[in-house]
UniProtKB/Swiss-Prot annotation:
Family: Belongs to the RIC family. YtfE subfamily.
Pfam families named among the record's database cross-references: Hemerythrin, ScdA_N
CDD domains, alphabetized: Hr-like
Stated role: Di-iron-containing protein involved in the repair of iron-sulfur clusters damaged by oxidative and nitrosative stress conditions.
GO biological process: protein repair; response to nitrosative stress; response to oxidative stress
Domain of life of the native organism: Bacteria
Subunit composition and interactions: Homodimer.
Protein species of origin: Escherichia coli O17:K52:H18 (strain UMN026 / ExPEC)
Name of this protein: Iron-sulfur cluster repair protein YtfE
Coiled-coil region list: none
Amino acid sequence: MAYRDQPLGELALSIPRASALFRKYDMDYCCGGKQTLARAAARKELDVEVIEAELAKLAEQPIEKDWRSAPLAEIIDHIIVRYHDRHREQLPELILQATKVERVHADKPSVPKGLTKYLTMLHEELSSHMMKEEQILFPMIKQGMGSQAMGPISVMESEHDEAGELLEVIKHTTNNVTPPPEACTTWKAMYNGINELIDDLMEHISLENNVLFPRALAGE
């Protein structure tokens, strides 16, 4: 099956573990989810046929849950428990670890300088963002007023773009989240946690941008 003309966001939602494949190739399926596979591959100078073959293998597996057809209220509850609550746990712990690593290894050239600052910025931005969703946007959607939420949704999508840009800065600061050979246990654990955060946040944004928001605006 030809996947090249389909949007990345749609593929990430319809094929099991496609999101992990896109992450491996550094293809943005959340904020850039509307671009086709062919366009995303061309931008990264990747062979689209190789990626299509990998997607075809993944597509043979059953999908755990197809959120594209789930009720909007169920999607919202899932987002809060699976992503919002998780980010609220992840970021404070990562900030503590980054503070320690930057302090203890300040003399090493490979230390991720500025990481604490960028994680703190992401924490502050996401905390404000998630609160606005939970207090304003999500109740509107649950009350069937999603079609009137064009303003709040455009603000949320803009904030998603800003979070995505911060993730790119964090990846650059951490050598694409790759610990150096001399990294201590805390350093390695922190990078594992950052990888998990990036995976979670990209899935979170994709579910909102590519499923929840379009369906809410369509008047569901």
